[in-house]
Amino acid sequence: MRTVSSLGRLALLILLAAPPALPAAELAAEPAALAAAARIELKRDDDQGTLQVLLDGREAFVYQYGHVDMPHLYPVQSPTGKSLTIQKTDPYPHHRSVWFGDDGELAGHRRASFYAPLYSQVNKQDPQSPYRDRIRHVKFLTEEIQDGQANLEAQLRWEADLGEVPVMDELRRIRVIPLGGGQYFLDCTFTVTAAYGDVTFRSDQTHYAWPYVRMHPQFAVERTRIEKGAGPGGKDKTVTETGAGTITNSEGAVNGAATCMKVARWVDYSATVDGISEGLAIFSDPQEPPPKFFTRDYGTFGPRRPDEQSGKPFVLGKGESLSQRVGLLIHTGDVTGGRVAERYAQYAAGQL
């Protein structure tokens, strides 16, 4: 986590210093192989508000930026084309596959919810109804393919009161690296800037990560569903069933009870679906102290900010910026077969 005290252009940190865990020769050989791993295409549709990223003609993921409560990635496809994430769930319909947001209060204004802006929609029966609070995609700054990688950069604005009150600006960067066999890696940096005045962050102590990922139920440790009117007195009933997924962190802990709110360099969520094991891992920034991770067996997980910026109000002064960098590894196999620990070592050594 980095705080930057300037409104000038923010540079993405790519060169890292953590020691590699792989043999030097193997690490050195990786970049050339990755550059030729797959052909990348970008397909942008402003009418639909989507930017599709394809590897060898197959969809890898889509950046959703149209009339949405907040821009997000969905779907995020596994190497064999299964949806690793889910866009909207019941319960927790505010979850958005892969998303980034938090509650914030611009000095002199009310608290705005950018964690769950869905609930601020003016007319909940009309999908095209505006949102009182919203993270809005402003424009793309970069869409390029170079040396076998894709680089995406977008300008966003966190807005309250139907767009009348700009709260913060955001610069979002995603570097896409194909790994072969349908696998790929996303190097993501999210930077928010208090461009319009002091902003007080008001995160919930428990229910937040930065960013969040919500796995599809077919990859979750537990499956939950709502049975309408099936509970006592005709109330809705939440049903939980054992799923196929497994959560594993860098320290060897397994599943939600052992990994939630525990410090780790990375957390992996994998499952065997239709006889094929695949998964998604979140990597923390190797240049920062390892964070605590929020994890849930029903499918949600992600890194948190440092303790002094978690679960308690803190102020981002006017002109200051706050950045979060993570890696997302989409892989075949489980945590071992997918070489998650080795891939993190590559990331830390600047080889991804």
Residue locations for each model-derived region?
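Beta-strand elements of well-folded, non-transmembrane domains
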Residues: L156-L162, I174-P178, V192-Y196, M215-F219, ...
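Beta-strand-rich N-terminal accessory domains
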Residues: L27-W99, D103, D198, D204, ...
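N-terminal secretory signal peptides that target proteins for export/translocation
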Residues: M1-S6
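Active-site/ligand-binding surface loops and adjacent short beta/alpha elements
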Residues: S203-E288
